[in-house]
Amino acid sequence: MLAQQVFNGLALGMGYALIAVGYSLIFGILRLVNFSHGSIYAFGAEIAMVFIVSMKFGIVPGILLSMLVTGVLGIMIDKIALEPLRKKGSPPIASLITTIGISNIITNLLIVFIGSEKRNFPNIFGYGMIKLGKVSITLTQVMMCVVSVVLMLILVFIVFKTKIGLAMRASQQNAKAAKMMGIDVNFVISFTFFLAGVS
């Protein structure tokens, strides 16, 4: 029983870890707790449902398209709501309150246009089950762990092995010095919002 609950917690925790990665990417550069991130995550799930169930795009294309949409939404939030505050030199609390407002807007738009009733996401990986002794593991749980690990490895590669990742880390350490070195910090921040939205 304990082993079963440990694995259930691990599979669920992998999903939460991906959400936390999005939070930490933005907090690392802006020192901003992005309260709209959870709403963006919910928006991505609803859009994926629309692509897969309503528009019949198929599971993989639907999920990839929804990731792209949430990434673009992240950029829009930064460009429309947060970048103007940075340019005005507004205090951090202004950006924090803005993200709370954005979260409320996204949540209420979802309720108005999609509804608030509970819906089950399509079972992508079937109902197969793997038995390891007394532990029963569904294919969905296995794939949640695999996909989460793969996405995290991709994010680690981007942050630590690419030029844009170097620019992100430079902006995190000292944004003013990064600007003096020719780094477009606003672009780096927008790219970070895109990554956070995709993840």
Language-model features and meaning:
Residues M1-N8, M55-G62, S90, I130-C145:
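Interfacial loop-to-helix junctions that mark the boundaries of transmembrane helices
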